[in-house]
């Protein structure tokens, strides 16, 4: 039998059995593409090619793959030769029909560990691509253990294998499967409220939503992150399918008996909450696994707002057979199962550190930690797995009970910037990679040298639900403080809720910043807090905490949400205010960063300053101000606001203004 005959026979068998398979093609780039083209020519199908520079249609970049979720393809090629976008790879696997091949193009097998991966630029905070040895070794181990996955290496013998026959698969007929039928019955009888259907990919949740719409007595509006992702839902809903984009729906005032939200976890929480409040009955569907944000985390974070929530889960695959080899290898490679989250750890707690090398030496340990973090955090994705395995500057602590993970803490090194770079960040001229809190302390704070201090930021912390409220989280933070004795502080950035803040307060953190707009992902304002460890860290924490107290009333008015600290009634312009105001007027500091000191400046100035007063005192939008002042756009408006701030400062004290300009990065030559 020729190679083509063997390939076609194996593909026919896969179609009859309702399964999909992964073929890894590893070698030089040209050789990999030649093999992929030959297989593509031998098998009819869609053959979606996912690559930064795919040579054939239909094609898609990894970044654009999100727009195709909810669609189906027969066969696909994923080119990871330059870099492995794990989330896009997982998402692509979920779009493939039964009987499909997924071809994964990879560099020469022996170079995987040492070869720089361009995808690392998205998650490593490095200026250049870095090798990713832990992920490469993990992928090799996973592939070597799976006889259902094929590996074709350049200059190595390869033949198409034969596999024992499986039970013949009966594809879905379009009628509800038993699991779906039971949920449909419950939904039809549901009183007003919110229902969720969560499932791994391929379980028919979009089909279920469409079947429900086609059979319901009332009316329904469908919304989703992208209309292109609702093809399956639309096919089952038929002529009763009525789609509106989330923002258009919110603006329209449209009404219906039901709102159906497909892939709800991918819609920003504040927007979703507003939509949900408008309809008597809501059906939310979302994926339980991590490449779109975890469905389990979606339930934890968003659905906790609805105590009478009706929860449904689909477990049996509909679009392919159980034990599909492609689904199994993707789940194993990207750790989509959550065994550590599902099993309760009992016994005394012991806390210890582990390092990235553990992925190669004792992989069960970091795997269990990742499973716990993934189950507890709604935004954990394969990108976090890549970062956990190979990004520099990561630190990990685990709390175990009888060899089971009960809690975990993940910290990231930050700060240590040069004085020159820190000052440039403060002035708004530079934004180097990474250093989330350290940069924010400089860019949004009062100290130009804040980013020179060295800290460790809490990236993730989780305690198993069965062991919460025992102080395990506080023990992890206390242990982290001891391990970071050479640092100036620990830091954390989080979506503010009173409950979360109480936890960080109990750990010893001091609130130093509140954002001025809600996070799209959580619907909360961003809060930043420091736990000082050195004298310099204490001075910085005290200084920024005091600044926040001075600005508290203004931020409360701006945000419409109280800040949890005692406000200071100090309206006089102090040295920090003057320095920051000059940074706004003559450098690139953002307007909303300088809310407090600009408000105080307006109180002291008798000048009209219409662009500043209109934005800060009247809260007019940029568009309104541009129309009112006959300005061409936001850039011109900001330039005018900077010029008006400069005018007010010079009028108050020209000499002081000039002295501060003279010592500013760039000499204050970048006046707006």
Provide a role label for each language-model segment:
Residues 32-33, 205:
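Conserved lysine of the Walker
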Residues 20-28, 39-41, 45-52, 196-198, ...:
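Conserved RecA-like ASCE P-loop NTPase motor core of nucleic-acid helicases/translocases
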Residues 393-412, 419:
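Conserved beta-hairpin
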Residues 248-250, 258, 270-271, 277-378, ...:
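Terminal substrate-recognition subdomain of acyl/acetyltransferases
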Residues 207-211, 460-483:
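Conserved acetyl-CoA-binding loop-helix of GNAT-fold acetyltransferases
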Residues 125-175, 304-342:
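Conserved coupling/interface region of RecA-like P-loop/ASCE motor cores
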Residues 65-162:
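N-terminal accessory nucleic-acid engagement/regulatory domains that precede
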């Amino acid at each position: 039998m020729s190679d083509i005959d063997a390939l076609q026979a194996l593909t026919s068998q896969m179609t009859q059995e309702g399964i999909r398979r992964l073929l890894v093609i590893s070698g030089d780039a040209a050789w990999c593409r030649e093999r992929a083209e030959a297989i593509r020519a031998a098998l009819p199908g869609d053959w979606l090619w996912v690559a930064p520079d795919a040579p054939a249609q239909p094609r898609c970049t990894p970044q654009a793959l999100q727009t195709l979720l909810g669609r189906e393809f027969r066969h696909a090629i994923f080119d990871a030769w330059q870099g492995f976008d794990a989330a896009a790879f997982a998402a692509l696997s979920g779009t493939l029909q039964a009987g499909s091949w997924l071809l994964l193009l990879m560099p020469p097998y022996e170079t995987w560990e040492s070869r720089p991966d361009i995808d690392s630029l998205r998650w490593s905070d490095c200026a250049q691509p870095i090798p990713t040895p832990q992920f490469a070794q993990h992928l090799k181990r996973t592939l070597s253990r799976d006889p259902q996955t094929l590996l074709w290496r350049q200059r190595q013998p390869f033949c198409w294998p034969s596999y024992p026959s499986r039970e013949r698969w009966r594809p879905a007929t379009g009628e509800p499967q038993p699991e779906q039928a039971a949920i449909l019955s419950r939904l039809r009888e549901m009183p007003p409220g919110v229902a969720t259907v969560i499932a791994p990919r391929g379980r028919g949740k979009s089909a279920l939503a469409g079947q429900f719409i086609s059979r319901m007595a009332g009316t329904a509006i469908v919304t989703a992150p992208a209309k292109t992702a609702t093809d399956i839902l639309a096919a089952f809903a038929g002529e009763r399918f009525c789609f509106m984009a989330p923002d258009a729906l919110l603006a329209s005032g449209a009404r219906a008996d039901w709102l159906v939200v497909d892939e709800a976890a991918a819609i920003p929480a504040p927007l979703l909450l507003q939509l949900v409040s408008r309809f008597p009955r809501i059906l939310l569907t979302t994926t339980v696994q991590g490449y779109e944000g975890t469905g389990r985390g979606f339930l934890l974070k968003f659905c906790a707002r609805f105590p009478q929530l009706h929860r449904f889960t689909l477990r049996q695959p509909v679009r392919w057979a159980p034990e599909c080899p492609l689904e199994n290898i993707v789940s194993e490679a990207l750790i989509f199962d959550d065994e550590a989250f599902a099993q309760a750890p009992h016994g005394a707690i012991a806390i210890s550190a582990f390092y990235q090398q553990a992925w190669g030496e004792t992989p069960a340990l970091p795997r269990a930690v990742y499973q716990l973090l993934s189950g507890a955090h709604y935004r954990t994705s394969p990108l976090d797995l890549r970062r956990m395995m190979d990004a520099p500057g990561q630190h990990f602590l685990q709390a175990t009970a009888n060899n089971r993970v009960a809690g975990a803490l993940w910290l990231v090194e930050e700060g240590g910037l040069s004085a020159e770079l820190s000052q440039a960040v403060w002035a708004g001229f530079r934004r180097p990679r990474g250093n989330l809190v350290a940069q924010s302390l400089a860019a949004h704070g009062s100290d130009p040298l804040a980013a020179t201090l060295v800290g460790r930021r809490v990236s993730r912390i989780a305690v198993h639900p069965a062991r919460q409220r025992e102080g395990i989280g506080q023990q992890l933070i206390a242990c982290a403080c001891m391990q970071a004795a050479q640092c100036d502080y620990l830091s954390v950035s989080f979506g503010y809720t009173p409950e979360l803040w109480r936890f960080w307060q109990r750990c010893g953190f001091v609130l130093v910043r509140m954002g001025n707009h809600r996070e799209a992902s959580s619907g909360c304002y961003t809060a930043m807090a420091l736990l000082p460890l050195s004298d310099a860290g204490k001075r910085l924490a005290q200084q920024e905490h005091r600044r926040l107290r001075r600005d508290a009333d203004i931020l409360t008015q701006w945000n419409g949400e109280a800040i949890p600290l005692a406000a200071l009634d100090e309206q006089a312009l102090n040295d920090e205010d003057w320095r920051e105001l000059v940074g706004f007027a003559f450098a690139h500091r953002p307007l909303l960063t300088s809310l407090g000191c600009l408000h105080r400046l307006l109180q002291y100035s008798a000048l009209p300053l219409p662009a500043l007063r209109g934005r800060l005192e009247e809260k007019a939008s940029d568009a309104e101000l541009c129309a009112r002042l006959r300005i061409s756009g936001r850039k011109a408006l900001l330039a005018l606001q900077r010029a008006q701030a400069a005018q007010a400062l010079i009028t108050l004290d020209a000499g002081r203004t000039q002295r501060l300009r003279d010592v500013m990065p760039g000499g204050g030559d970048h006046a707006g």
